[in-house]
Amino acid sequence: MTTVRTRIAPSPTGDPHVGTAYIALFNYCFAKQHGGEFILRIEDTDQLRSTRESEQQIFDALRWLGIEWNEGPDVGGPHGPYRQSERGDIYAKYAKELVDAGHAFYCFCTAEELEQMRAEQQARGETPRYDGRALLLSAEEVQRRLDAGEPHVIRMKVPSEGICVVPDMLRGDVEIPWDRMDMQVLMKNDGLPTYFLANVVDDHLMGITHVLRGEEWLPSAPKLIKLYEYFGWEQPKLCYMPLLRNPDKSKLSKRKNPTSVTFYERMGFMPEAMLNYLGRMGWSMPDEREKFSLAEMVEHFDLSRISLGGPIFDIEKLSWLNGQWLRELPVEEFATRLQKWAFNSDYMMKIAPHVQGRVETFSQVAPLGGFFFEGALKLDAKLFESKKLSADQVRQVIQLILWKLESLRQWEKERITGCIQAVVEALELKLRDAMPLMFAAITGQASSVSVLDAMEILGPDLTRYRLRQALDLLGGVSKKENKEWEKLLASIA
């Protein structure tokens, strides 16, 4: 009997997302419920954004939650390497096979040619897509251009008509017209694969039997199915999971909700409660109980109990569930966990240099730096009153800084300062006009330790969370303001 093998394949391009943890949990439970294996693979072909620091954060976040893997970059295994950036020769080999078999072709179109092509298609009211012009090149012309070293990509051929039937374990057969599919790029001009080729090749070579992924990938499933057909490989069973939603039913995003697993760890949530809550996202226990462990979820896991309605990720409900777990801890374990969360040496060493020179007794540390150990702050609206800025300008400054910080790939003091500086310059203000607002939002105080150091220590999600808190306190942002300020944001370097 074939061993069930599932996987999670996150990209190390930022903080570990709760959506990644959610999909990882369901893949893990499905594999373990069937006595199978769960694999961790790293999709790091985006060389500009991928970092080893983000990769380590993924490892740490999943392990904090209690999700372990049988094979992966850090534990090894018989199907490695498990980083896509280390599998380039493998992808090149299989891409060449597709070209030789007539299922893919070389495309030498420049970015300017492609942009002009799309513009002309849009002007005609057509859906922009690659028009197949490289297919008209003769074999001799293709070889000449390859020999000359011209930049190129490899694209797959797709049918221009007909229906592709996608067998989904949740929805049954889903019919998707082929005329919605583009001639997908498989290998980029830097020699790295795109998601489609890398996933099909890796899933096959790693013996993946079942793929549980987010439903945002369902519309492009025909491309994956066609690649399996071209290679002559057996296709894994496919399951497209419902996406997590904000309370307003929009797709979960860091603009409306903290999305980093690290944020919830820093906020003092228990990993058991976090897993429990993610397990309730569209799934339920047979007896409908709300509180259950990972082991209990594995024991009773059944895909038929997944609801297709978009599950709502609500911090208030997560907090309620966390309280259930917290209050049931033996008091000794409660004390141990509290000490580990608040007073662990790594975190204290980040904070100590910033408070030591400002206190005369240890009892003064809490009033000065207590905000380091809090989640949501009790903010005072009076702290946001400015002699120079109007109430609308105060909200504008905070909102623009919040948006600007969302674009940061590396969370460092110098880059944080740069974001704030860019906003105040665009608004023709001084740094001293914005910093009191940052102190009020981030520390809940008029003055404290360096707020820029505090933002770096607290991390991106908790910092942004507190800025959103401040905006809510001050009345939020109207749709009209949101539209106007986003235009202004686009002009800020």
From Swiss-Prot:
InterPro entries: aa-tRNA-synth_I_cd-bd (IPR045462), aa-tRNA-synth_I_codon-bd_sub2 (IPR020751), aa-tRNA-synth_I_CS (IPR001412), aa_tRNA-synth_I_cd-bd_sf (IPR008925), Glu-tRNA-ligase_bac/mito (IPR004527), Glu/Gln-tRNA-synth (IPR000924), Glu/Gln-tRNA-synth_Ib_cat-dom (IPR020058), GluQ/Sye (IPR049940). One of its GO terms (biological process) is glutamyl-tRNA aminoacylation. Its EC number is 6.1.1.17. It catalyses: tRNA(Glu) + L-glutamate + ATP = L-glutamyl-tRNA(Glu) + AMP + diphosphate. A motif ('KMSKS' region) lies at residues 251-255. Gene3D superfamilies: 1.10.10.350, HUPs. A motif ('HIGH' region) lies at residues 10-20. Its main location: cytoplasm. Pfam families: Anticodon_2, tRNA-synt_1c. ATP binds at K254. GO terms for molecular function: ATP binding; glutamate-tRNA ligase activity; tRNA binding; zinc ion binding. It is found in: Cytoplasm. GO terms for cellular component: cytosol. Keywords: Aminoacyl-tRNA synthetase, ATP-binding, Cytoplasm, Ligase, Nucleotide-binding, Protein biosynthesis. Belongs to the class-I aminoacyl-tRNA synthetase family. Glutamate--tRNA ligase type 1 subfamily. Monomer. Catalyzes the attachment of glutamate to tRNA(Glu) in a two-step reaction: glutamate is first activated by ATP to form Glu-AMP and then transferred to the acceptor end of tRNA(Glu). This is Glutamate--tRNA ligase. It comes from Pseudomonas putida (strain GB-1).
